[in-house]
């Protein structure tokens, strides 16, 4: 039975109240103990969703400020202003500004134009349409940090139109083409979302949360290099796996007619589309060569956002209407600030010391790594939000890995990539899932079977080929 909003709010208020009534564990400061209660309540709030993510985080920030100001000895460890530190993080603004590019692809119609050209060139069979989806998502992913916007706003409407044109009906003929293509849309986006740092907002969030624990940082291009070999291999296999589990009844497609109709509706390519194409290339160039250009990825994104406005590709009003960008700015900056409070108050250091006395993986760092990454995928059945999973579990898994001697670089990369592909296990593992599943072509059984094959298959690929590749990059000094 679904919980009422009032019941959810009572649960959220009870959690920090418990940390007020109970004494702090040995070795943990009182302020860290009380802030932990707020943090746990925040994570539970992201799962229960009595309100949207921004409201939950703003409430958590407000409560944290009150606690810091009224807890004895708190100001020796943290200051009231520290709870807002997440909003001055470069990654927070990188994600926010990258949303402008994402919106521009939808507003100008460039995303649809690219898709129809791909369909016309390669989509002569349903299997090839699966690969068209893959290539399109991969092409758009560096500039769309909301995989929900990318999948739901650009790719899903096009594939849904194709499915309808092929005569596949959710009730009468779902297996004709719709079941395969809709499942493929979701499984593809869960892999493209970790190939690029800017392909999904929780990527940067995971990095930010792990940095104080593992001391691991990376750049846009190093992230891509690390993800490229295992990620592209997994991506290539996904349309085949979906095709094998849910083979479409229709094999051949009149792709030329579909592409022609779609392009005719769009009309000739506009100046805005041409300008956006150039800016997209500039953004990729800037992110790839940011070190050589002596500018960071955030500045590149801000430059491109400003140029999009100056060239009238989008207007400031368009940016104001981008709810996803503003929502992400508020909750993302908030969760980084909350995690920073725990780090400054000594919670993660205490957690590491506590776990090191409990866990016995001395001399078996690789075994610890395998166990942690397997758990990181397995627990995704419990989470309906990638952001909630990252905030709740990534710091814990990072801490456990650190104290058990798991190799730092391998652990960090394994966790950030598993964050995305791990969400494949269910139809609610990320925002694009309910969109594709909600079209009505799929059943839960085949979806979950496919998701398990892809998620745990990706895990095996990353534990073998992926780690061999990362070790090679490390030996060359490229990671």
From Swiss-Prot:
It holds the Pfam family Na_sulph_symp. The chain crosses the membrane at residues 11-31, 43-63, 90-110, 151-171, 195-215, 223-243, 274-294, 295-315, 328-348, 447-467. InterPro entries: CitT-rel (IPR030676), SLC13A/DASS (IPR001898). It comes from the Bacteria. Keywords: Cell inner membrane, Cell membrane, Membrane, Transmembrane, Transmembrane helix, Transport. It is found in: Cell inner membrane. This is Uncharacterized transporter HI_0020.
């Amino acid at each position: 039975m679904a919980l009422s909003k009032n019941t959810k709010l009572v649960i959220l208020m009870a959690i920090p109240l418990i940390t007020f009534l109970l004494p702090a564990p040995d070795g943990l400061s009182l302020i860290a103990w009380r802030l932990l209660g707020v943090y746990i309540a925040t994570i539970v709030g992201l799962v229960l969703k009595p309100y949207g993510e921004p409201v939950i985080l703003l409430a958590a920030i407000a409560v944290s400020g009150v606690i810091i100001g009224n807890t004895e000895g708190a100001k020796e460890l943290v200051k009231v202003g520290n709870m807002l530190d997440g909003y001055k993080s470069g990654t927070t603004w990188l994600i926010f500004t990258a949303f402008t590019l994402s919106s521009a692809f939808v507003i100008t119609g460039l995303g649809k134009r690219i898709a129809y050209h791909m369909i016309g060139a390669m989509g002569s069979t349903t299997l090839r349409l699966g690969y068209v989806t893959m290539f399109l998502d991969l092409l758009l992913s560096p500039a769309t940090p909301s995989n929900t916007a990318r999948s739901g706003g650009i790719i899903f409407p096009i594939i849904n139109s194709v499915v309808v044109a092929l005569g596949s009906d959710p009730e009468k003929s779902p297996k004709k083409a719709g079941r395969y293509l809709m499942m493929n849309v979701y499984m593809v986006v869960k892999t493209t979302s970790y190939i690029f740092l800017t392909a999904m907002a929780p990527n940067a969030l995971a990095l930010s949360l792990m940095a104080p624990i593992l001391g691991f940082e990376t750049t846009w291009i190093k992230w891509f290099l690390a993800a490229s070999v295992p990620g592209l291999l997994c991506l290539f296999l996904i349309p085949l796996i979906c095709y094998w589990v849910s083979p479409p009844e229709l094999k051949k497609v009149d792709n030329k007619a579909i592409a022609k109709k779609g392009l005719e509706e769009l009309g000739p390519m506009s100046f805005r589309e041409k300008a956006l194409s150039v800016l997209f290339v500039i953004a990729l160039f800037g992110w790839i060569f940011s070190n050589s250009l002596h500018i960071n990825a955030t500045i590149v994104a801000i430059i491109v956002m400003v140029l999009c406005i100056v060239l009238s590709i989008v207007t400031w009003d368009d940016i104001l209407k981008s709810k996803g960008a503003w929502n992400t700015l508020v909750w993302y900056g908030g969760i980084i600030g909350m995690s920073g409070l725990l780090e400054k108050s000594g919670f993660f250091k205490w957690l590491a010391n506590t776990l090191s006395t409990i866990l016995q993986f001395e001399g078996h760092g690789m075994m610890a790594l395998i166990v942690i990454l397997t758990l990181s995928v397995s627990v995704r059945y419990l989470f309906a939000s990638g952001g909630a999973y990252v905030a709740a579990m990534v710091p814990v898994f990072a801490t456990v890995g650190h104290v058990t001697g798991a190799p730092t670089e391998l652990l960090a990369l394994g966790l950030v990539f598993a964050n995305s592909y791990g969400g494949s296990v269910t139809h609610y593992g990320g925002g694009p899932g309910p969109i594709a599943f909600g079209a009505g072509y799929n059943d839960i059984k085949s979806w979950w079977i496919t998701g398990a094959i892809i998620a745990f298959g990706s895990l095996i690929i990353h534990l073998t080929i992926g780690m061999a590749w990362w070790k090679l990059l490390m030996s060359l000094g490229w990671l």
